[in-house]
From Swiss-Prot:
Endpoints of the signal sequence: 1-29
Complexes and interactors: Accessory component of the STT3B-containing form of the oligosaccharyltransferase (OST) complex. OST exists in two different complex forms which contain common core subunits RPN1, RPN2, OST48, OST4, DAD1 and TMEM258, either STT3A or STT3B as catalytic subunits, and form-specific accessory subunits. OST can form stable complexes with the Sec61 complex or with both the Sec61 and TRAP complexes. The association of TUSC3 or MAGT1 with the STT3B-containing complex seems to be mutually exclusvice.
S-S pairs: C87-C90
Induction, as annotated: Induced by low magnesium levels.
Role, per record: Accessory component of the STT3B-containing form of the N-oligosaccharyl transferase (OST) complex which catalyzes the transfer of a high mannose oligosaccharide from a lipid-linked oligosaccharide donor to an asparagine residue within an Asn-X-Ser/Thr consensus motif in nascent polypeptide chains. Involved in N-glycosylation of STT3B-dependent substrates. Specifically required for the glycosylation of a subset of acceptor sites that are near cysteine residues; in this function seems to act redundantly with TUSC3.
Protein name as it appears in the record: Dolichyl-diphosphooligosaccharide--protein glycosyltransferase subunit MAGT1
Family: Belongs to the OST3/OST6 family.
């Protein structure tokens, strides 16, 4: 009976020894992993304290963003800011991204849960090739674990690149809420003060005759300008902050009309405003031709000009509508 007991005791001791030996490399690897993670976080915090948007090249991107371990998210803006790239949108997007990163860096909620970084094409073209990226600017959120999903790529053409819109997207992807604080802009108050001063000066100079305040033509023109601005999508631009236009980085072709019905460019607003103004002017000419007391020749010319303006600008307007709402069956003169 002693021999089996001795045998089983030796087996138990050997099993415990093997278990302890197997745990030693695992514990050592865990400590090494924690040390690497601590070094990466410390390095990122040091850079973020100096500059909220960390500039990265290929080596930094692979080591700090792609390679594990990570317990932080990195929102990376891929851009092309060099002058010879002629990317106007990249400059505008960079300004908004800097505002967002500064708002996070100097907020009371600032932690090491999320960092902001930037990869310029001329400093990290290998990163663009690695990610099969062929357009800029592009915003991607790299989560702490796993690869970025489709929703981790910011829809720039739909949302625009305003800091507030990017902050909402970041809150959806990381649960980190950032309150955007913009630097004070005194242009608006100065222009308002100048406008009030001009109006006050006119009222003072014409204080003996205030009939101009009851001028129907003046009020009608002001109301028409307001209506044209609102119907062209100016308020949407103010809320979303879209780019002025989009330049294809490969062909250099500039698009002023967005191809989707869910978004628009600032230039598109100006074009629609111009077309609406042309249709309005044509209608005014037609009304004047029908009701004025001028001779028949001038009235005929006004009628022809009015019809031409309405037909031409309405046809252009309808062609823009067809380009944005694919499958729309109707057209007029132009397709």
């Amino acid at each position: 009976m002693a021999s089996p007991r001795w045998f089983w005791s030796v087996c138990a001791i050997a099993a415990v020894a093997l278990l302890l030996v197997s745990k030693v490399p695992s514990a050592s690897a865990q400590r090494k992993k924690e040390m690497v993670l601590s070094e990466k976080v410390s390095q990122l915090m040091e850079w973020a304290n100096k500059r909220p948007v960390i500039r990265m090249n290929g080596d930094k991107f692979r080591r700090l963003v792609k390679a594990p371990p990570r317990n932080y998210s990195v929102v990376v803006m891929f851009t092309a800011l060099q002058l010879h790239r002629q990317c106007v949108v990249c400059k505008q997007a960079d300004e908004e991204f800097q505002i967002l990163a500064n708002s996070w860096r100097y907020s009371n909620a600032f932690t090491n849960r999320i960092f902001f970084a930037m990869v310029d094409f001329d400093e990290g073209s290998d990163v663009f090739q690695m990610l099969n990226m062929n357009s800029a600017p592009t915003f991607i959120n790299f989560p702490p674990k796993g690869k970025p999903k489709r929703a981790d790529t910011y829809e720039l053409q739909v949302r625009g690149f305003s800091a507030e819109q990017i902050a909402r997207w970041i809150a959806d992807r990381t649960d980190v809420n950032i309150r955007v604080i913009r630097p004070p802009n005194y242009a608006g108050p100065l222009m308002l003060g100048l406008l009030l001063a001009v109006i006050g000066g006119l009222v003072y100079l014409r204080r003996s005759n205030m009939e101009f305040l009851f001028n129907k033509t003046g009020w009608a023109f002001a109301a028409l300008c307001f209506v044209l601005a609102m119907t062209s999508g100016q308020m949407w631009n103010h809320i979303r902050g879209p780019p002025y236009a989009h330049k294809n980085p490969h062909t250099g072709h500039v698009n002023y009309i967005h191809g989707s019905s869910q978004a628009q460019f600032v230039a598109e607003t100006h074009i629609v405003l111009l077309f609406n103004g042309g249709v309005t002017l044509g209608m005014v000419l037609l009304c004047e031709a029908a009701t004025s007391d001028m001779d028949i020749g001038k009235r005929r010319m006004m009628c022809i000009a009015g019809i031409g303006l309405v037909v031409l600008f309405f046809s252009w307007m309808l062609s823009i509508f067809r380009s944005k709402y694919h499958g729309y069956p109707y057209s007029f003169l132009m397709s």
